[in-house]
Amino acid sequence: MEVKAETMRESEPNNTIETSNIITRNDETAYGAANGTYDGQSVVYGYSSKDDIDFYKVYLYQGINYMTCNDHDFEYEITGKDGTLIQKGIYKDLNIFGPTAYKVDIPRTDYYYIKINGCSSKSESYLFLIGSPTYSVNNYSVKCTEGTVSMTQSNGNKIVHFDLTSVEDIPKDAIVYSVSMFGIRTTAVKSIKLKNEKDKKEILLEKYVWNKKALIAMEMPAVSTWSAILEYNKNISFIPTLRVDYAYPVYNTMIQ
């Protein structure tokens, strides 16, 4: 699979507005994170210190954007073409999992300047993206609320439920790109139909492997109650487990 993320490396000299490096706005989507291509991702990579200021020029859209930072500590400052200060801040590497994002309200669609200044006396690396939020992926597994399910040959259909509505680790904006069912006897199953109770969308899991991939376009919310219609053809008891794989925008920090 081709990775389509773009990495732009700092090019010296860029210590004045006039010598600013022109960079590309980050334009990531959940789809790119889910399929591993990271299409639209634009990462800026450079080195800075207290005595080494770096300038970048970027075209941003009006509205909420995100300054996503990683690596070593640095100060950032975002200004308009006329020198108007839009936002400034300090990124601190607190050894948290992944990058930290800061919301930036851009007043109008136009070019803007970003000033980066390292916090150390020695030159240290930094990373940032600006524009859309970056996306990450994660997963969560949950057993059915009914506990042990008993099936018979004469009554082979049952509905079970999986509750992810109160799972704090799943971001509210997470959308599903893959689902899997575990804890079942593959040879005893006829079919499994899964339903997202929040948006009422249904999917039929692939037979024998009991999963379904490439679901990102359906935009199903991960935070939901899920129901499954299980069709069995044997006398058997089991505890089904649902695994939900999801992508989510990083509005602050990633969830480990």
Segment roles from a protein language model:
Residues 3-54, 62-65, 91, 133-159:
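Non-catalytic extracellular/lumenal accessory regions of secreted precursors
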Residues 84-95, 144-149, 189-193, 197-213:
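Solvent-exposed serine/threonine-rich low-complexity stretches and specific carbohydrate-binding patches
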Residues 98-105, 162-166, 210-218:
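Exposed aromatic-hydrophobic patches
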Residues 38, 100, 107, 123-135, ...:
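Long luminal/extracellular ectodomains of secretory-pathway precursor proteins
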Residues 142, 146-185:
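Short, surface-exposed binding/anchoring microloops in extracellular/periplasmic proteins
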Residues 113-115, 196-256:
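Cysteine-clustered segments with highest specificity for TGF-beta superfamily mature ligands
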Residues 54-56, 116-133, 235-249:
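Edge beta-strands of jelly-roll/beta-sandwich modules across compartments, strongly enriched
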Residues 46-111, 115-123, 171-175, 180-195:
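Acidic, Ser/Thr/Pro-rich low-complexity intrinsically disordered segments
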